């Protein structure tokens, strides 16, 4: 069982306002760092409580960091996520880093430096391109469009989207197919069922010589 928490920069952005924190990163960086230290301490304790309660790990959602430049992400997000990972991750409790921004490929170095056990990316990026940057021993997950397919798509369209991602990415043994983010409310069960059916279809076809 995995728990979920918001990431440090994303939490700070909720507290300050997204637009304001973007400005403060340039105009008052020291203040942003103070807030990030406090946010990181809070999230760390939150993760420890999940760990003590018996969770097997936690997903740290850091989507607002996807709005930063690679340089700013390396300063204001990655190191703070790493502090959390270093404090809570071990063989019995894993951290999955989530970022659904469209610049994650450009900032992948600082993302990988967090040391998370696995990484999850949204549909704003080319997942096949992302996989070329992921070390072979590290799991990466993604990235069927949650809103466009699970919420607003059809069984036929989500089948095509799922098979498309898998065709492009399953040559990497460390790739795991998933939605690109949370499944939106009111998503139709037939679309969710179609996603899993497509996954089964892909692997059945692979076993029979598909691809």
Where are these regions (language model features)?
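Active-site loop segments of alpha/beta catalytic cores
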Residues: 1-211
């Amino acid at each position: 069982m995995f728990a979920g928490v918001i990431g440090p920069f994303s939490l700070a952005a909720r507290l300050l306002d997204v637009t304001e924190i973007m400005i403060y990163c340039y105009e008052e960086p020291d203040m942003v760092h103070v807030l990030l230290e406090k946010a990181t301490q809070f999230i760390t304790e939150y993760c420890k409580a999940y760990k003590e309660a018996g969770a097997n790990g936690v997903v740290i959602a850091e989507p607002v960091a996807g709005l930063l430049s690679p340089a700013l992400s390396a300063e204001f997000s990655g190191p703070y996520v790493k502090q959390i990972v270093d404090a809570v991750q071990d063989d019995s409790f894993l951290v999955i880093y989530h970022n659904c921004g469209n610049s994650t490929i450009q900032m992948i170095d600082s993302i990988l430096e967090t040391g998370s056990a696995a990484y999850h990316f949204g549909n704003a990026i080319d997942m096949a391109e992302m996989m070329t940057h992921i070390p072979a021993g590290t799991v990466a997950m993604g990235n069927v469009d949650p809103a466009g397919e699970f919420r607003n798509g059809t069984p036929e369209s989500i089948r095509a989207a799922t098979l498309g991602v898998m065709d492009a990415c399953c040559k990497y043994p460390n790739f795991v197919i998933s939605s690109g983010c949370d499944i939106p409310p009111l998503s139709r069960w037939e679309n969710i069922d179609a996603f899993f059916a497509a996954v089964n279809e892909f692997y059945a076809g692979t076993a029979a010589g598909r691809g």
